[in-house]
Amino acid sequence: MSATTLPEPAGAAAVRPAAVSVHGAWKSFGGQQVLAGIDLEVAAGEVLVVLGPSGSGKSTLLRAINHLEQLDAGHVEVGGEPIGVRHYRGRFKELGQRQIRVQRGRIGFVFQNFNLFPHLTALDNVAAAPVATGRATRAEARERARALLDRVGLAERAESYPRQLSGGQQQRVAIARALALEPGVILFDEPTSALDPELVGEVLAVIKDLATSGTTLIVVTHEIGFAREVADSVVFLDGGRVVEQGPPSEVLSAPRHPRTREFLSRVL
């Protein structure tokens, strides 16, 4: 990652401090521009829904937030701390992998295809990260994992393996796993896109419950009804840029930009 100049200090603080700040994010793959100078702030405890067509940069933005993708320029801060980089003589330098892993432990990530360990039970999938990071003993981690599985409605499936679970159940295990390290921010990358339609509701119900917990959520989804009901703010991306941003009542019900209106007319 090339070094980039630090931005000037921000002005007056928001009512709620920023949990996530994206500053001038640029990213391309093979000459294809995927993120084109995105600036974004997500307040602590906010639920942000990110909408946009395929290829608009939604997943890349999420992956950049926890440094699964290195930006070509710009940087991301979580809780005021640069992610994946450090300040060095007025510029940014890449952190070592061990430091990056520590930072990622504070950012939950729920993938669209579950990414569970197939050889571990639901219980051990949830307990794995706290043990691996030294945050808990195996007994402590398993006790908390049982509580988290109960929270997502799967206490009775604790000893089941992923192959024995439906897609919706696997995704709920993945959400419990994301909660195991008690992150301040959780990223959801189209968490219902791989599910049969009848299973979508059970996963959205868990995310709705999380939305009331005070955890900052950033959710990439095409579930417009969910966005209307749960989101504090909606961002519409197209061509790697923020086209429109605001409360659901504005972006979804009275969008200002023609591209937003065109997109919504196709998905509603």
Regions found by a protein language model. Give the residues of each.
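ABC ATPase "signature
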Residues: Q245-G246
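Catalytic Walker B motif of ABC-type/P-loop ATPase nucleotide-binding domains
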Residues: I186-D189
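Short coil-to-helix segment of the ABC ATPase nucleotide-binding domain corresponding to the Q-loop/switch region
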Residues: L120-A128
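Conserved ABC ATPase signature
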Residues: Y161-L165, Q169
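A short, proline-enriched helix->beta-strand linker immediately N-terminal to the Walker B motif
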Residues: A180-G184
